[in-house]
Amino acid sequence: MKRNAAIYARVSSDRQREQNTIASQTALLLEYATTRDCVVPQDWIFQDDGYSGSVLARPGLERLRDLVAEGFIETLFVYAPDRLSRKYAYQVLLLEEFSRCGAETVFLKSAGGDNPEERLLVQFQGMIA
């Protein structure tokens, strides 16, 4: 049975916007989600275009958090930890919040986080983002 999944993508700079990286992040994540036997409804693709990763007040992220809290999302795909947040404390907060609500967070460009060593690597990447 296919798992319900969502995608979160973010860019903050004009250069990133010009390079169309939010679309490329989304396309890569959609492709990856299909390999993990997940279905991503179109309205479960959350994007924050032009928002800094150093703040939590982002419209796409807020809608995503609401949906995760309602228990609908089983898997969340994000390109890399720094796309979720540029602050380590916020990354930990969000990852724990999603996990507590039953959503697995999968980063395309990072260690999987399935064991203590991989979780430590994700945390380390968050500290230097």
Predicted feature descriptions by range:
Residues 1-129:
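Short, structured surface patches at the beginning of a domain
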